[in-house]
Amino acid sequence: SEIFIAGLLKEIPADVKYIVVSEAGASIYSASKLAAEEFPEFDVMQRSAVSIARRLQDPLAELIKIDPKGIGVGQYQHDMKQARLDEALGGVVEDCVNAVGVDVNTASYSLLSYISGINLASAKNIVKYREENGEFTYRAQLLKVPRIGAKAYEQAAGFLRVPGGKEILDNTGVHPESYEATEKLLALFGYTRDDVRNGNLKELRGKVTKAGSAKVCEQLG
């Protein structure tokens, strides 16, 4: 297939390129209950094709829909106790999702369910709330979602992003509890919210290191 496509592109005058995407686990997804739920009118081949294409757009969001064992994590994975393997692989997926964070306005419930403090039921409620009320414009709106209480919100807030929302810090990894300290840190080094919005904080870490982390913490109280 790759040789055919490469040869075909040579005959096209426009600047067209191709990208190779791993199809590992795509057949597992295409035959899953989730795939049938997402694409009820598609056959398994079409679902598989969509899954592979989506991996190019957002790899993490798509790969979490597949049992990690189906992706192939080593030739000896079946020699381990399956319960222990599931726990280990699930932990890695959860760590990855929380390290990256997710857009609360576009994430599927399957992706949201990996966020700390959110289970499958509350993840589905977030999607339902979003469909009925429109996009979230700030993190605290999550408290209006059924099954998202104060404790769950506290655990999840820092991992959920709200691009284009009313509060620029809602689109960062900063937890709401640390917003005040963040404001002080920005002001201390001459930055503003616009710098956060425009991604002009590349030198901030170096400035903090130069000033001394302990001293900066003392100044911030």
Regions found by a protein language model. Give the residues of each.
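Phosphate- and other anionic-substrate recognition elements at nucleic-acid/protein interfaces
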Residues: 1-90
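Short, charged low-complexity intrinsically disordered segments located at boundaries
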Residues: 36-39, 79-93, 155-161, 210-219
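Accessory alpha-helical DNA-binding modules that contact the DNA backbone or grooves
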Residues: 99-221
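Charge-patterned, long linear interaction tracts outside catalytic cores
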Residues: 58-129
